[in-house]
């Protein structure tokens, strides 16, 4: 990529570089063309290989997930599981047992009723001297049984055929009730099985639909589908600009998800609000100059906001605001940023205070001259008298 050096862009860069009481702001707007050079082509190939590995890993993951979902469907379905089969068998077994016991109970009751009726007929007589009517034990009395009982009681006699018919009717009623209950239970269990089966089928369908999506739908962060060359090129352009701007840093770990696609209006308002917070008045001519070189209405803006910024290793680093303006028509990319760091004076304030403080002479006394006398030239015999020397010279 080729760097575009313009005089008005240099004026913008000078405006975006300033200092506050405790911070230093480094800002710039660097414009590059998307025409690739030899080093850029090598970088593009490396990025393509990296993205191909990501795509292959995603396809392998989807294939294994499809196999895991297909295995339980072929071997065992929800409705053919042993839980449901045992449940149906147990229901049918207990239902048959209940019917058998119920029929035995009815037969015993009928025999007991017949024996009791014969004994009662011999011991007790009705008001007309005839045997009274014995009422069969039944759960319910229908209209026909009630009429027969009333007529037989009034006449004082009851035929055995009426008793047999009433007992048969009672058995029919009981059978109908038991069959209706069993049919209701079987219908309820089948409905439960059907609902559970449909629920599992719906879940499997949703999983299959998410797995069977084409690899083209795999998004490359804010740049679009991962297998489209245009999406990969945009990502490669931004990495190439970062490499050119910061050659001492390694950007091999930068992922497409570290970038966020935002609107131009949102980024401009955030940029100007940052300048306001730093005590600087935003200049309209700055955006006019950038618009003359980039045509902002045709630009797509990507903001670089990773979880861990590469600038954190820099001394005194505080925060950054980084954006990339990409114009496909003009084949240009603008790198616009603000980086805030602490001033050097604030970091070394203690050292500066110590350097400015006046220091006295350092005297080292080890006690070696404690008993030595001081040199006093007044009482020294070897002192040369300057006056005597002068007089001798005059003579």
UniProtKB/Swiss-Prot annotation:
Q: Which UniProt keywords apply?
A: Cytoplasm, Nucleus, Phosphoprotein, Repressor, Transcription, Transcription regulation
Q: Which InterPro entries match?
A: Maf1, Maf1_sf
An MF annotation (GO) of this entry: RNA polymerase III core binding
Subcellular location(s) of the protein: Cytoplasm; Nucleus
Can you supply one Gene Ontology CC term for this chain's record? nucleolus
Q: What is its main location?
A: cytoplasm
Sequence segments annotated as region (Disordered): 69-91, 104-138, 152-223
Listed GO biological process terms: negative regulation of transcription by RNA polymerase III
* Superkingdom of origin organism: Eukaryota
Q: Which stretches are tagged as biased composition: Polar residues?
A: 69-84
Nucleus recorded as keyword: yes
Question: Modified after translation how?
Answer: Phosphorylated by PKA in a TORC1-dependent manner. Phosphorylation at PKA consensus sites RRxS/T decreases upon rapamycin treatment.
Other remarks on record? Answer: Present with 1720 molecules/cell in log phase SD medium.
Q: What's the stated role of this polypeptide?
A: Mediator of diverse signals that repress RNA polymerase III transcription. Inhibits the de novo assembly of TFIIIB onto DNA.
Recorded hits in PANTHER family, A to Z, give: REPRESSOR OF RNA POLYMERASE III TRANSCRIPTION MAF1, REPRESSOR OF RNA POLYMERASE III TRANSCRIPTION MAF1 HOMOLOG
Instruction: Give the protein name, as stated in the record.
Output: Repressor of RNA polymerase III transcription MAF1
Q: Please name the taxonomic classification of the source.
A: Eukaryota, Fungi, Dikarya, Ascomycota, Saccharomycotina
């Amino acid at each position: 990529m080729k760097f575009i050096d313009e005089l008005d862009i240099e004026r913008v860069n000078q405006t975006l570089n300033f200092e506050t009481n405790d911070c230093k702001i480094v800002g710039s707007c660097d414009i590059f063309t998307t025409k690739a050079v030899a080093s850029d082509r090598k970088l593009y190939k490396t990025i393509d290989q990296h993205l191909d590995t990501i795509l292959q890993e995603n396809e392998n993951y989807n294939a294994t997930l499809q196999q895991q979902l297909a295995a339980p469907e072929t071997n065992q379905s929800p409705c053919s599981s042993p839980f449901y089969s045992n449940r149906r068998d147990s229901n049918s077994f207990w239902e048959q047992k209940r019917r058998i016991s119920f029929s035995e109970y009815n037969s015993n009751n009928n025999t007991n009723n017949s024996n009791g009726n014969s004994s009662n007929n011999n011991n007790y007589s009705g008001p007309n001297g005839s045997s009274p009517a014995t009422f069969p034990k039944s759960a319910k009395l229908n209209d026909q049984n009630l009429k027969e009982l009333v007529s037989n009681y009034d006449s004082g006699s009851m035929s055995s055929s009426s008793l047999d018919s009433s007992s048969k009717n009672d058995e029919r009623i009981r059978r109908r009730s038991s069959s209706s209950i069993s049919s209701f239970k079987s219908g309820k269990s089948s409905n439960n099985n059907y609902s559970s089966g449909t629920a599992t089928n719906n879940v499997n369908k949703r999983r299959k639909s998410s797995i069977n999506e084409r690899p083209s739908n795999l998004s490359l962060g804010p740049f679009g589908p991962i297998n489209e060359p245009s999406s990969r090129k945009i990502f490669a352009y931004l990495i190439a600009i970062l490499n050119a701007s910061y050659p001492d840093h390694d950007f091999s770990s930068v992922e497409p998800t570290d970038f966020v696609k935002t609107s131009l209006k949102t980024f401009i308002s955030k940029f100007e609000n940052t300048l306001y917070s730093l005590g600087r008045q935003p200049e309209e001519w700055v955006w006019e100059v950038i618009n003359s070189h980039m045509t902002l209405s045709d630009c797509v803006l990507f903001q670089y906001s990773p979880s861990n910024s590469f600038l954190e290793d820099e001394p005194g680093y505080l925060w950054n605001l980084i954006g990339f303006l990409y114009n496909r028509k003009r084949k240009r990319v603008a790198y616009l940023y603000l980086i805030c760091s602490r001033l050097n004076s604030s970091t070394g304030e203690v050292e500066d205070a110590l350097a400015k403080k006046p220091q006295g002479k350092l005297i080292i006394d080890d006690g070696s001259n404690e008993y030595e006398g001081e040199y006093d030239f007044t009482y020294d015999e070897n002192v040369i008298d300057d006056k005597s020397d002068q007089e001798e010279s005059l003579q």
